[in-house]
Amino acid sequence: MKTNLPLIKLGLASAVAIAAMGMTGCGGSSDKDSTAGGDAGGGITECISNCTASGFALPENAIYVAADAAEGSDIKDAIITALTDTPDNAVIVLPKGSFVVSSSIAVTDAEGITITGYGIDATKLDFSTAPEDDGFKFAGGNDLTIRDLGVYEAKKNAIKADGVNGIHMAYTAAVWEKDLELGGDENGAYGLYPVSSQNVLMENNYSKGSADAGIYVGQSNNIVVRNNTAEHNVAGIEIENSNNADVYNNIAFDNSAGILSFDLPGLPQAYGGGVRIFNNNTYDNNTTNVGAGAVALAPSGTGILIFATSDVEIYNNTISGNVTGGVEIASYFLADADVPNYGTNYGATMVNGWSPLIKNINIHDNTFSDNSLLSPPKTGLLEAIIQGYQFGFNHTGAQQVAPAIIYGGIGELLSNAGQLEAFNGIVGDEAKANGVNYNAYGAKDAICVSDNINKNTDADLNVGKVYGTNPFDAANWNETQTAPEASLRIDLMENNTLLDCTLERLAPAVVTIKGTVYGCSGDDAELAACKL
């Protein structure tokens, strides 16, 4: 397995600049020195003077905070003063250098403001002496931007935006320098964290050392996550219970899991969908998972994980060196197999449309190399499954590795057998109108794997299905035909018979901030990745 990690030795500005280089073509390059990229975006203009490192022009009426502050001094009070009664659309400029911020910075119901430093490496804010809270915390408001700065050692989340319509994070770092440790309390939770928001644009950012997700968007709608780098977090980039999200041209490496799309029960926005994950480079995500809660379920050694969500398209990614699996697709039954008690345990959220099932997952035109190589696996969640595969032999008679793409299949089997039909009585009218159901899977509900590229150096590229999905096949049930039984099916990726099908392409996400449309339907419309 290759061990070179070229970004580790680079500064943050260099890492983000690399993420803005082009990686085009079907599947891109499997060379780990090749990185995801695309149009830099984020308001870069022809800036001659008075600019940030990213090229953002500072206006004449900008509000300068602690411009003469000494290196290492505490600028908390100056920031709070500048953010008190701030006029709409103000640009607030934090000083160049490294400074202490000894309390959380709260911004409530602001309109159109921009908080900027002088660059992702040029303005560094140390929150290590602040109380147990977020670094920056935006609550409500419209069309807000934070950019060109780094938040270090926040006790909770580095930057949180809750209930904002139009949130733009660009050229921003969220960093915890300490290595991740089980039971450790020195690494914060989320790095960059928009939640319950609309029109979310995350670009050219960097996150390292988060004990949960480095770049996370949850319970939000209309999202673009592009040109970011996530390194050495539990989850690199995560989309959770969110609708209409495009995740492209990102780099995720040395996390426990690179890129994730989840729907979790019990959240105010019950479910998401319409998530496209494309033209990313997710590699060597083998860090031990020390997370708590739902993120602890993510198997260490995972390139991309799709968990209990539907309507996801994964294409043109380079996925390599992830020792448990390249792409893993699992229903919530993997985490909780107590199907008879789902109505009792999850009924309140199932009314609103949350479902343990996964449907309409389209995996195509990705390049895979050197995934699924670990024995034994690094996580208990898939341990029995991975070891079960490793006891078998591939078509050449050699002991096989676990498949690069693994699909659980148990939810589809139970649906096709009619054993989940009673759950239809729980689903509320709005969710039913949006297609949430527990009927047998139709063609549009399928999990499809097609046209992927094998760059493995010394092993077959395999696809696996843990449970067969035909309810009339006795091999999918135990001896008394009363409960599902894992059959651990495996086939070569090319012309596979397990998941070989095609689905309709998903529509691009549309993000609008201050009247400008971002993403593949807007400023990136001519980008090669958006034409794939």
Question: For each predicted feature, which ranges?
Answer:
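Extracellular beta-strand/beta-solenoid scaffold signature
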Residues: 76-79, 102-103, 127-137, 153-161, ...
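Bacterial N-terminal signal peptides that target proteins for export
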Residues: 2-12
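Right-handed parallel beta-helix
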Residues: 112, 116-121, 142-153, 165-180, ...
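Short, T/G/N/S-enriched strand-turn elements that build extracellular solenoid repeat scaffolds
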Residues: 79-85, 100-109, 115, 125-126, ...
